[in-house]
Amino acid sequence: MATEHNVQLVPGSQKIPKGVVSPRSAAEGPALTRRRSKKESWHPGSQKASSGDQSSSQGSEASGSSKHPPRTKVGQEEPSSAPARPASHRHSHRHRSDPQQDAAQRTYGPLLNRMFGKDRELGPEELEELQAAFEEFDTDQDGYIGYRELGDCMRTLGYMPTEMELLEVSQHVKMRMGGFVDFEEFVELISPKLREETAHMLGVRELRIAFREFDKDRDGRITVAELRQAAPALLGEPLEGTELDEMLREMDLNGDGTIDFDEFVMMLSTG
């Protein structure tokens, strides 16, 4: 009879035949396989592919940026695509002299300067205005005002002197006039400023006065004969016949051979 042998399996003593995978090795196998597959995803070939994808995505971003240009920061000027204009265009709107206006200024300019310009004498109304302003600041009524009151007195007359102008006037009064001025000295100080202020403020009344200096017969028109007659006294020199004819032709807007007051005013206007 065959003898039965009781075989006891001792843990760890059993040998595993070749070709048979133990449960532990089987568990490790997939883990090794997973690590291997992860390493394969880091293969240089895959890096090249990913870099190619990045380059393609960067290219798409670059193409998209060309469609949508970057915004300009606040305070930064946008580049102008329009071509720069030549420098000559900057001065294309300069004021061009008008022959008619030049002729009028040449004819009537000396008269107006003598009557209403910087070299004219003050009229009675202007002297009365200065007298009233002087008396307002002569508080003790002794006929003098101090240099400290000159600035306020000038402002009362409508002038706005600068600090430098006030300093010059004050120094002049203190050093040469003892710090006080009487009315005559006050007029000497103020009249140049007054003439300068009104030299370019000719009203209708002043223009009519100048017009009557030429219009001797008071018919409201200036003829060639009247222009020739008034020229030596008003302009300081006689005018030749051809020069008179040319001047009258340039200033005679309606072509009637004479200059009326409207034409006189229009030719003297500096528009």
UniProtKB/Swiss-Prot annotation:
<dbReference type="GO" id="GO:0060040">
    <property type="term" value="P:retinal bipolar neuron differentiation"/>
</dbReference>
<feature type="binding site">
    <location>
        <position position="254"/>
    </location>
    <ligand>
        <name>Ca(2+) 3</name>
    </ligand>
</feature>
<keyword id="KW-0770">Synapse</keyword>
<dbReference type="InterPro" id="IPR002048">
    <property type="entry name" value="EF_hand_dom"/>
</dbReference>
<feature type="binding site">
    <location>
        <position position="258"/>
    </location>
    <ligand>
        <name>Ca(2+) 3</name>
    </ligand>
</feature>
<feature type="domain" description="EF-hand 2">
    <location>
        <begin position="179"/>
        <end position="196"/>
    </location>
</feature>
<dbReference type="Pfam" id="PF00036">
    <property type="entry name" value="EF-hand_1"/>
</dbReference>
<protein>
    <recommendedName>
        <fullName>Calcium-binding protein 4</fullName>
    </recommendedName>
</protein>
<keyword id="KW-0106">Calcium</keyword>
<dbReference type="GO" id="GO:0046549">
    <property type="term" value="P:retinal cone cell development"/>
</dbReference>
<feature type="domain" description="EF-hand 4">
    <location>
        <begin position="239"/>
        <end position="271"/>
    </location>
</feature>
<dbReference type="InterPro" id="IPR011992">
    <property type="entry name" value="EF-hand-dom_pair"/>
</dbReference>
<feature type="binding site">
    <location>
        <position position="263"/>
    </location>
    <ligand>
        <name>Ca(2+) 3</name>
    </ligand>
</feature>
<feature type="domain" description="EF-hand 3">
    <location>
        <begin position="202"/>
        <end position="237"/>
    </location>
</feature>
<keyword id="KW-0479">Metal-binding</keyword>
<feature type="binding site">
    <location>
        <position position="217"/>
    </location>
    <ligand>
        <name>Ca(2+) 2</name>
    </ligand>
</feature>
<keyword id="KW-0966">Cell projection</keyword>
<dbReference type="InterPro" id="IPR018247">
    <property type="entry name" value="EF_Hand_1_Ca_BS"/>
</dbReference>
<dbReference type="GO" id="GO:0005829">
    <property type="term" value="C:cytosol"/>
</dbReference>
<keyword id="KW-0597">Phosphoprotein</keyword>
<feature type="binding site">
    <location>
        <position position="219"/>
    </location>
    <ligand>
        <name>Ca(2+) 2</name>
    </ligand>
</feature>
<feature type="binding site">
    <location>
        <position position="144"/>
    </location>
    <ligand>
        <name>Ca(2+) 1</name>
    </ligand>
</feature>
<keyword id="KW-0677">Repeat</keyword>
<feature type="compositionally biased region" description="Basic residues">
    <location>
        <begin position="87"/>
        <end position="96"/>
    </location>
</feature>
<feature type="region of interest" description="Disordered">
    <location>
        <begin position="1"/>
        <end position="105"/>
    </location>
</feature>
<dbReference type="Pfam" id="PF13499">
    <property type="entry name" value="EF-hand_7"/>
</dbReference>
<feature type="compositionally biased region" description="Low complexity">
    <location>
        <begin position="45"/>
        <end position="67"/>
    </location>
</feature>
<dbReference type="GO" id="GO:0042995">
    <property type="term" value="C:cell projection"/>
</dbReference>
<feature type="binding site">
    <location>
        <position position="215"/>
    </location>
    <ligand>
        <name>Ca(2+) 2</name>
    </ligand>
</feature>
<comment type="subunit">
    <text>Interacts with CACNA1F and CACNA1D (via IQ domain) in a calcium independent manner. Interacts (via N-terminus) with UNC119.</text>
</comment>
<feature type="domain" description="EF-hand 1">
    <location>
        <begin position="125"/>
        <end position="160"/>
    </location>
</feature>
<dbReference type="InterPro" id="IPR043582">
    <property type="entry name" value="CaBP1/2/4/5"/>
</dbReference>
<dbReference type="GO" id="GO:0098793">
    <property type="term" value="C:presynapse"/>
</dbReference>
<keyword id="KW-0963">Cytoplasm</keyword>
<dbReference type="GO" id="GO:0008594">
    <property type="term" value="P:photoreceptor cell morphogenesis"/>
</dbReference>
<feature type="modified residue" description="Phosphoserine; by PKC/PRKCZ">
    <location>
        <position position="37"/>
    </location>
</feature>
<feature type="binding site">
    <location>
        <position position="138"/>
    </location>
    <ligand>
        <name>Ca(2+) 1</name>
    </ligand>
</feature>
<feature type="binding site">
    <location>
        <position position="140"/>
    </location>
    <ligand>
        <name>Ca(2+) 1</name>
    </ligand>
</feature>
<comment type="function">
    <text>Involved in normal synaptic function through regulation of Ca(2+) influx and neurotransmitter release in photoreceptor synaptic terminals and in auditory transmission. Modulator of CACNA1D and CACNA1F, suppressing the calcium-dependent inactivation and shifting the activation range to more hyperpolarized voltages.</text>
</comment>
<dbReference type="GO" id="GO:0044325">
    <property type="term" value="F:transmembrane transporter binding"/>
</dbReference>
<feature type="binding site">
    <location>
        <position position="221"/>
    </location>
    <ligand>
        <name>Ca(2+) 2</name>
    </ligand>
</feature>
<dbReference type="GO" id="GO:0007601">
    <property type="term" value="P:visual perception"/>
</dbReference>
